[in-house]
Amino acid sequence: MAKNRSRRLRKKMHIDEFQELGFSVAWRFPEGTSEEQIDKTVDDFINEVIEPNKLAFDGSGYLAWEGLICMQEIGKCTEEHQAIVRKWLEERKLDEVRTSELFDVWWD
């Protein structure tokens, strides 16, 4: 049985029109990649992919990176966002590029 919830409560619970979809991403730099090259690649990733598409990235790593991508504002990532991220990483010849299915970043 569906519950009627107020807009305020739906926003607090991140449901319905306030649901936020995101996806996990992971990749690996080739062995021997310098720290400077890793920093430059991650900076370029943020400047060329994340910011222009109004995405947010929370991740970390050294040679092996993993993280979460979601929207900067309340919203839903799309399969197009996944494809843009995957394509950019693969074009840089990074290894083991993986993106997950879209999931609810608050409830999954």
Swiss-Prot record:
Superkingdom of origin organism: Bacteria
NCBIfam families to which the protein is assigned, alphabetical: PRK11702.1
GO biological process, one term: ribosome assembly
Family: To H.influenzae HI_0341.
Spans traversing the lipid bilayer: none
Record's GO cellular component terms: cytosol
Pfam families: YggL_50S_bp
Record's protein name: Uncharacterized protein YggL
Source organism (scientific name): Escherichia coli (strain K12)
Signal peptide: none
